[in-house]
């Protein structure tokens, strides 16, 4: 499946937001707002200006990225097309299915990127070399 995924399979998801004078809360549940069961959560922070993160693809793992604070862009690539999503609201998420090369770029100062993943960490699931990614997609 992941060999045939395209950037059209990446999608923004609006997360319900409940708020009043005390602030806001957004709730994310497995197989509801997240189109998969979450098995791992991590977050990126204190990213120096001009630095990027990601620059890899997954063979099986789905990811959901959220700008928990600040903002950043996500450049997605399916070996044929490229698109850039902008994330800057904590009640909006980007679903990145397996087989998509993704790079997180242009972080604002103090940005926090929250990532929900469908799989536990497994180095074998990563395609870290772009030429390996192209070979995978064209196999």
Question: What is the meaning of each model-derived region?
Answer:
Residues 96-99:
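Short beta-strand-centered segments at strand-helix junctions
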Residues 101-108:
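Beta-rich strand-turn-strand
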């Amino acid at each position: 499946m992941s060999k045939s995924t395209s950037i059209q399979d990446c999608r923004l998801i609006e997360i319900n937001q409940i708020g009043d004078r005390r602030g806001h809360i957004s709730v994310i549940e497995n197989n509801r707002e997240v189109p998969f069961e979450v098995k791992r959560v991590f977050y990126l922070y204190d990213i120096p200006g001009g630095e990027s993160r990601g620059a890899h693809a997954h063979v099986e793992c789905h990811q959901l990225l959220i700008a928990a604070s600040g903002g950043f862009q996500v450049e997605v690539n399916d070996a044929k097309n490229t698109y850039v999503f902008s994330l800057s609201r904590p009640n909006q998420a980007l679903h990145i299915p397996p087989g998509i090369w993704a790079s997180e770029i242009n972080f604002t100062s103090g940005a926090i990127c929250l990532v929900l993943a469908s799989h536990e960490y497994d180095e074998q699931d990563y395609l870290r070399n772009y030429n390996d990614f192209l070979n995978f997609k064209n196999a």
